[in-house]
């Protein structure tokens, strides 16, 4: 039997900070707001204690990416902030330390109560896979900081254009070669390989 600690227990387009009794190292919060164009913006905030991490959509050799099982099927565009690389005991993973926010866009008919279960993997010396059931009352506002926080989260996403002056890739005899040039030079460059969706 799992015992859940809900902070706070309120119905709003803001879940408040949720913690699970079996994982005191992470807190999660979901907020959502439907826009005039019909799209719904959702922000998943994750706060991790020092020394703990969670994972990117392509977590690397270990770890599990966060996922949401929606109670109502939805079309979701989940956006991922630029990750960090973690090398521990010869295993390389990609993800996040500290606080991270994942901005998402939901399309389609949003029910008055948006609910589901977030599954989040967090790791330090041990790994914990935790489920966070949530329910958002979409008839109420997400709060006055939502637009600011969503815009700020969008600013943490990888740049699509303008970072390189030249980018080429070739695959010959089982070897992938990626060449990236930047006129301004590089400071601590990193390449993150993402699996195909």
Tell me what each language-model feature is.
Residues 7-9:
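N-terminal signal peptide c-region/cleavage motif recognized by signal peptidases
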Residues 11-197:
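Extracellular/lumen-exposed scaffold segments
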Residues 1-5:
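Sec-dependent signal peptide recognition
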